[in-house]
């Protein structure tokens, strides 16, 4: 039974959000880490993201049943109680907000609340089934954890926080569009109006390339603005990011298999954001 409730939290999404949070926190810390604040904020983000994922699963349980990828989720097949999950999400939300309010700062708590509301209330409940632009809204909520990490240290929403928000928003778009192409039939079965369905795969590929270019520019701006200072950051992130762009451009080949290509794009998007978070975390060490 515990395993089923764990599945309802979407562990993969929770883990990726924690990883980006760590990147933002260590970037702002610049080698001077307050381990108590780090641990408490990490737990706060863990509880908030968990709450968001559980609520998302509750709201999406009907469309999850129509999609091959999600049809066996616990809430979709009714193997766990909706009421219990609601209570679970509420408790996680309260604990997360309490930790952030009492041990970090009001800005960090506010960002977490905004991220939760945007993800659950605006993206999942209002826009996901109605608009192709829901992906943009979802990207905002997905970009909040690294900003929380940064602001937990800085206690201000400055240029660094804005750049992190832009970087992770821009990354989410090609990542999500790759999934959309890869799972196109699932989204069609669930009648979700994603870009590849409404505008076509070719247009979606154009968007992917544009967003990756913008992502590359903002990751470089993070260095130009002095928030990262090591040459290792520039070398590693640019190598991986330009390779990601190269893979994106391969999608225009006449003999391209869109399913295989989108799978490669999805996998490489994870490599790109993981390497970015890692290099942000290690930048202060490399800069010594």
UniProtKB/Swiss-Prot annotation:
Record-linked InterPro entries: Protohaem_IX_farnesylTrfase, UbiA_prenyltransferase, UbiA_prenylTrfase_CS, UbiA_sf
Source organism superkingdom: Bacteria
Record-stated family: Belongs to the UbiA prenyltransferase family. Protoheme IX farnesyltransferase subfamily.
Annotated TM spans: 8-28, 35-55, 80-100, 107-127, 132-152, 162-182, 208-228, 229-249, 266-286
Protein name per the record: Protoheme IX farnesyltransferase
Organism, as annotated: Baumannia cicadellinicola subsp. Homalodisca coagulata
GO terms assigned for molecular function: protoheme IX farnesyltransferase activity
Membrane topology, record value: Multi-pass membrane protein
